[in-house]
Amino acid sequence: MPLFRKPAITPALALSKYKAGDYFTLPIVSTQTGNANSGFLVAFPLFFPNISIDRIGCLVTVAGGVGSLGRMGIYNASTTAAYPSSLLIDGGTVSVSTTGNREVTVALTLAAGFYWLAYLADTVVTSAPTMRQQNVCINPFAPIVSTNTLFQSGSGVRAAGVASGSLPATFPAGATDLGGTGGIHIIYTRIA
C-alpha cells in the first residue's frame, strides 16, 4: 500500500497539508553561496506527493552582469539509476542580474514520485551571479542503498558545457556526482 494512503504508518511530516502559496524544496540544514558559471547545469532529486506547482525559483545573493539569465526546469527521474533522465518542463529564464528570489511561472501537476529540480546558467554577461546553495541537507531518501551515492547524500549532479537557449531534452550523461559536498543551487517550487 502506498505510504501516503495509510495514515497509521505515514510520518507526521508527510501528513502535513500542502497549501496553495507554500514553497516546497529539499530540507536543508545549512547553506553556502557559489557562482552560477556559464554552461553549468545542476540538478538535485526531490520526492513530490501528488501536487500542482505554479512557480520554480532560486535565490540570487550577488547579482550577475546586466543581461545574465538563469533557466530553471524539472527532469524526470531515471528508472534505472539515481540520475535525472528526460526533461519534464523547461520553465524558461529569469534575470539573475538583480538579487533576491527569482521565479518562473509554470502550470504543472506532478504525480507522486521522484523528480530532479534543475538550474542552468543560461547566459552570463561579464560576471556570474552568486546563488544560495545547499551545504548540508537532510537526506529524505534514507535508507536507500545504491552503488550511486546521490540518494545517500541527498545532493545532486553538475554537468558542464551545456549550451544556452533551452534545457537539454535528456540530462547530459557523465555529470559530476557532487555527493555530500554541497554546491547545488537551491531550487524551490511553489504549490498552486
PLM features: what roles do these ranges have?
Residues 1-15, 190-192:
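Short, intrinsically disordered N-terminal pre-domain segments
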Residues 7, 63-67, 176-179:
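A short beta-turn/strand-edge loop motif at beta-sheet boundaries
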Residues 22, 42-47, 90:
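Short amphipathic
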Residues 27-39, 93-98, 178:
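Extracellular beta-rich ligand/substrate-recognition surface
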Residues 36-39, 47-55:
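Extended extracellular/luminal ectodomain segments enriched in beta-structured repeat modules
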Residues 51-62, 117:
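A short beta-strand element within beta-rich, extracytoplasmic domains
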Residues 67-147:
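Aromatic- and Gly/Pro-enriched, solvent-exposed loop/edge beta-strand patches characteristic
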Residues 121-192:
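Short, surface-exposed beta-strand/loop patches at domain edges
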